[in-house]
Amino acid sequence: MPIDALGRTISGAIHDRIAVNGTHLHYVSLGTSGSPILLVHGFPETWWAFHEVMPVLAERHRVHAVDLRGFGDSDLANDEFDSKVAAEDLHQLITALGKGPMHLVAQDISGTTAFRLAATHPDAIASFTAIEMGLPGFGMEAFADVTNGGAWYFGVMATRGIPDMLLAGREAAFVGDYMFPSMCAVPDAVGEGDVAEFARTYARPGGWDGATGLYASVLKEGEKIVALAQSDAIRVPVLAIGAGGGPFTEHTMKRAAPGTDVRSIQIGGAGHYAAMEAPERVAAAIRDFVGEVDAARIA
């Protein structure tokens, strides 16, 4: 059953919450025809990260943008939440929607979750687009090494309870005054309204716990992700979209998915949050790639 939007929305979008894997996920749908696409946000984001990408894709596709467990208007995450749990959440969401294999698009910290999903449930995935994404075991741990230029917040986010302790009442300041400005190359790409929408749900008690589960996964799951990669589990076509991180995403995916075709594109002039900074170019890259994959599947 559709629900009223609890925060911001876009014209024509349908909001829903669905019971999967012992939790409830909030997702937003747009578009009535074409092959289905599942969009998975990063940090410090929610489904809203794709609010300008969705209308472009919905011209040809049925588009679904999900709030991961512990994020947005989905249920909170518990102590057991990690990338494996998140991947199963998404697998059960795809199954429940009943629209066949989906084109998976994920970015940033959701990379480990998306990689697990594509590797362990290949029948559920038609293609895999990675936007500004790293993986544990393939160099992402370096971002936590503050002695060599890593990000201070990485360890903070990976430690349950510490984000609530330090950021309570400062959610908008952290998101809007630090996180986005520090990694965006396009001024004002993330406006005050966007910041308010992201901060709205991080401000709930336990609102950072979803992020904690995914950041902790990066620090402890490297061997498991490398083992998946070495099994050549990724067989669907892959598109690596780089922006502020340059060719890092391309290099990661070519090493992690050696058994399949990995294409790449660079979004010049955009920073890390490419879907917010250059939504039309990101949407066009996804649309063109998905269109080619669909055509090959039909042929």
Annotated model-derived regions:
Residues 32, 41, 52, 80, ...:
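Residue-level detector of alpha-helical segments with a strong bias toward transmembrane helices
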Residues 270-279, 283:
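Catalytic histidine-centered segment of alpha/beta-hydrolase-like enzymes
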Residues 21, 44, 84, 280:
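Conserved phosphate-coordination/catalytic loops
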Residues 28-73:
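Conserved HGGG/HGGXW glycine-rich cap/lid loop of the alpha/beta-hydrolase fold
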Residues 2-17, 23-27, 36, 64, ...:
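Flexible "cap/lid" subdomain of the alpha/beta-hydrolase fold that forms the substrate-access gate
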Residues 46-47, 112, 271:
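A short, glycine- and basic residue-enriched loop/turn
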Residues 48-51, 55, 88, 115, ...:
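Surface-exposed alpha-helical interface segments used for non-catalytic interactions
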